[in-house]
From Swiss-Prot:
Species per Swiss-Prot/TrEMBL record: Salmonella typhi
Residue stretches spanning the membrane: 8-28, 55-75, 161-181, 185-205
Role summary: Involved in a secretory pathway responsible for the surface presentation of determinants needed for the entry of Salmonella species into mammalian cells.
Pfam annotation, one family: FliP
The protein's name in its UniProt record: Surface presentation of antigens protein SpaP
Lineage, opening ranks: Bacteria, Pseudomonadati, Pseudomonadota, Gammaproteobacteria, Enterobacterales
An example Gene Ontology biological process: protein secretion
Record-level GO cellular component terms: plasma membrane
Predominant place of localization: membrane
Recorded family membership: Belongs to the FliP/MopC/SpaP family.
Subcellular location: Cell membrane
Membrane topology label: Multi-pass membrane protein
């Protein structure tokens, strides 16, 4: 019976793992930024979605490694077993403290407060003094409240970064369009000229490397 419970728990975790990686790590930001940069360059399928997602996944694993390592060390030291509910609950509360701190640090505080209050209202059925707590008083929010807050915060941050990255490429498109109009070449598509120019500039600046470094440096203090 114990082995059956362990197998069910393992299968359930394996099913949820892709969703946790996609929305509960920095993968969500990396993948969105990479796709937006590709679109800003005027390239539709180069690099492919698989390539961009693979690079985003590798960078995310590099960033999240300290947190995964701490959780694994706790798992080994405390001898957590899948057929013991109390052991799993303790692992979520204590073994994932590093991950909880990561989620708190990179989540919008207002979103954390919203989901925490919504969870408490759903649990108690009405507003209580606990629900009315100030956001600074929440010491240890639930991971289930932190995950949606973190995902939305990362999406918002990714779109901000994408906007700033889009601007110089839009300027190139506008300049090329103005030059073609001034030369009377209205029949020529500006994309035909602007795309090679944007590619040359991006490659000359080593854009993918600079972009990856900039994204990673935002998370380099998570192990401290």
């Amino acid at each position: 019976m114990g082995n059956d419970i362990s197998l069910i728990a393992l299968l359930a975790f394996s099913t949820l793992l892709p969703f946790i990686i996609a929305s509960g790590t920095c993968f969500v930001k990396f993948s969105i930024v990479f796709v937006m940069v590709r679109n800003a360059l005027g390239l539709q399928q180069i690099p492919s979605n698989m390539t961009l997602n693979s690079v985003a996944l590798l960078l995310s694993m590099f960033v999240m490694w300290p947190i995964m390592h701490d959780a694994y060390v706790y798992f080994e030291d405390e001898d957590v077993t899948f057929n013991d509910i109390s052991s799993l609950s303790k692992h979520v509360d204590e073994g994932l403290d590093g991950y909880r701190d990561y989620l708190i640090k990179y989540s919008d505080r207002e979103l954390v407060q919203f989901f925490e209050n919504a969870q408490l209202k759903r649990q108690y059925g009405e507003e209580t003094e606990t629900v009315k707590r100030d956001k600074d008083e929440i010491e240890k929010p639930s991971i289930f409240a932190l995950l949606p807050a973190y995902a939305l915060s990362e999406i918002k941050s990714a779109f901000k970064i994408g906007f700033y990255l889009y601007l110089p490429f839009v300027v190139v498109d506008l300049v090329v369009s103005s030059v073609l109009l001034a030369l009377g070449m209205m029949m020529m598509s500006p994309v035909t000229i602007s795309t090679p120019i944007k590619l040359v500039l991006f490659v000359a600046l080593d854009g993918w490397t600079l972009l990856s470094k900039g994204l990673i440096l935002q998370y380099m203090d998570i192990a401290t």
